[in-house]
């Protein structure tokens, strides 16, 4: 694989992340009846560049009592994992067409927990540690439902390859037959990416800023980039799983445009939810998963396992 292929994937993601921060501030601004950033450049379009320059030229401070290696390694690992999650995403062709693309995404998003845990522990601050423990418990819990929902979708798809979902959804989007799963999936992705109303890791009133409270300048920017890259990736995955774009081999650009539009709409929904809903209480967050989502997803998964045998049908194979 050539280096140019990897760069062609990474650079657009980082640019998208930069402008997503601007979009979020604009949307929140308009929802709160104010303008949002509008000074730097026309309509505030250069604001992300100004933010990046400011963050990366500041001195990265490190607490004297922190663990130097882990403290530096955690943000690097977070961004590396966030970018590697994009490898099997078909847009319409993935960087590497993995046979078990879905399992790769699950495994990589599970590894992201370590970067949060390391950053909280290495900071040697009680606020950071409590924030990290909350984030880890939340991420691991919601990964359970994500895995079961993915298993149900793969039963319908007949394969663990993400590219096959395009073929499966040629005639009908999977959101129509699987709408309960789609709703639970969307709420679980909000919790998985630590977004409002599940942003308990960043409870300003209790934890100052959560697991990244001791970070400043460059390392903080890396965490920030990782979080937003994960948001876009999760929405792209939602679009692929439930709103499959039609792929015409003669015009692959149409598929890409279609996918980008759907991802953008879903990302706007994330921001809309942030502007509209207050934060959950921690026990409510856990009850929602273990007492509501888990039994329901397990029941639906058992139904999807038994349906082909019951109705003597077979899942669509390539």
Curated annotation (Swiss-Prot):
Keywords: Electron transport, Membrane, Mitochondrion, Mitochondrion inner membrane, NAD, Respiratory chain, Translocase, Transmembrane, Transmembrane helix, Transport, Ubiquinone
Entries under Pfam families matching the protein: NADHdh (PF00146)
One cellular-component annotation, GO: mitochondrial inner membrane
EC number: 7.1.1.2
Primary location: mitochondrion
Localization: Mitochondrion inner membrane
Catalysed reactions, as listed in the record: a ubiquinone + NADH + 5 H(+)(in) = a ubiquinol + NAD(+) + 4 H(+)(out)
Role, per record: Core subunit of the mitochondrial membrane respiratory chain NADH dehydrogenase (Complex I) that is believed to belong to the minimal assembly required for catalysis. Complex I functions in the transfer of electrons from NADH to the respiratory chain. The immediate electron acceptor for the enzyme is believed to be ubiquinone.
UniProt similarity note: Belongs to the complex I subunit 1 family.
Identification of the protein by name: NADH-ubiquinone oxidoreductase chain 1
Organism from which the protein derives: Dasypus kappleri (Great long-nosed armadillo)
UniProt gene name: MT-ND1
